């Protein structure tokens, strides 16, 4: 019978002073993670219990009288493995597996030890998409400088960062004014000597990264083929989204302002107007 030792372990945690340690563990969707049950030197475990504390409190695994058990009804059923060192392995991980976990252990002398861990599960970063926008005058010569905007975008991913790298130079550094929209857009000026220079957009989060590389000089043709992006298209990239939000806010304020009563009055007047005009129309010969 396993219920009695489980209740005794929970009573240990509730009634006795215990040592609590914390750590953060990072992993990605589709992978696995090992939650290590760390304990002091010489701590010989007699009983142990792994639980999920947040977003829901669930029993995940237990160790009692030398027996390991993980067949508990939880969101990790079939995805949890308790190792002989009492570390808990979870996988394959899903996007909703982030949360707080705890392991409560009691040694052979009856002394408890609790460890809490925070698991954060991230989506793997996909390969980004880089678009090239050119800003050149139509009468410019092919040998002249070409102003280029590089736009980088990774779909359906949160908590990511963007960075750029010039592939032909190890110590390439971007000036602050050449980056826009949190690093997603890079403005560069190219000359004839930059024909073979490639730029890479690197997208990363705490557990993964990917990149896409382009050679922007290939787009610096002053007789652009149909479908090529011009400098006007850059506005679609660099204009802040806050402008749209501002318009929505102004529209909402106008829609709910007190002047709506005046509109109702005007509508009522419009309805009455034709009725007062009808008798005049009927008196005409």
Swiss-Prot record:
Residues on Cytoplasmic side: 255-285
Record protein name field: SLAM family member 8
Keywords tagged on the record: Disulfide bond, Glycoprotein, Immunoglobulin domain, Membrane, Signal, Transmembrane, Transmembrane helix
Domain of life: Eukaryota
Entry keyword Transmembrane: yes
GO cellular-component term (any): membrane
GO biological process: B-1 B cell lineage commitment; defense response to bacterium; immune response; leukocyte chemotaxis involved in inflammatory response; negative regulation of dendritic cell chemotaxis; negative regulation of macrophage chemotaxis; negative regulation of monocyte chemotaxis; negative regulation of neutrophil migration
Cell location: Membrane
Record-annotated Ig-like C2-type domain positions: 128-215
The protein's role, per its UniProt record: May play a role in B-lineage commitment and/or modulation of signaling through the B-cell receptor.
Region (Disordered): 262-285
Entry-linked SUPFAM superfamilies: Immunoglobulin
UniProt-annotated glycosylation sites, renumbered to this chain: 85
Transmembrane segments: 234-254
Extent of the signal sequence: 1-22
């Amino acid at each position: 019978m396993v219920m009695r030792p489980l209740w005794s372990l929970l009573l240990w945690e509730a009634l006795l002073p215990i040592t609590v340690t914390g750590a953060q563990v990072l992993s990605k969707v589709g992978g696995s993670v090992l939650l290590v049950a760390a304990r002091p030197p010489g701590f010989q475990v007699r009983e142990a219990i792994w639980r999920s504390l947040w977003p829901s409190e669930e029993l995940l695994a237990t160790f009692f009288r030398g027996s390991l058990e993980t067949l508990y009804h939880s969101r990790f059923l079939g995805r949890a493995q308790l190792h002989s060192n009492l570390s808990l392995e979870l996988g394959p991980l899903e996007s909703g597996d982030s949360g707080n976990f705890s392991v409560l252990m009691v040694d052979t002398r009856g002394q408890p030890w609790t460890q809490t861990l925070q698991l954060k599960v991230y989506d793997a970063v996909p390969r980004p998409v880089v678009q090239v926008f050119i800003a050149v005058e139509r009468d410019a010569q092919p040998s002249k400088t070409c102003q280029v905007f590089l736009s980088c975008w990774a779909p359906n991913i949160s908590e990511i960062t963007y960075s750029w790298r010039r592939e032909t130079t190890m110590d390439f550094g971007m000036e602050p004014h050449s980056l826009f929209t949190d690093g997603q857009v890079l403005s560069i000026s190219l000359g004839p000597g930059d024909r073979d220079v490639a730029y890479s957009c690197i997208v990363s989060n705490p557990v993964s990264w990917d990149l896409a590389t382009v050679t922007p000089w290939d787009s610096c043709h002053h007789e652009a083929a149909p479908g090529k992006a011009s400098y006007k298209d850059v506005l679609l990239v660099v204009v802040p989204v806050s402008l749209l939000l501002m318009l929505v806010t102004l529209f909402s304020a106008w829609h709910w302002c007190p002047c709506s009563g005046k509109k109702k009055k005007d509508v009522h007047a419009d309805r009455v107007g034709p009725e007062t005009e009808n008798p005049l129309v009927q008196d005409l010969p």
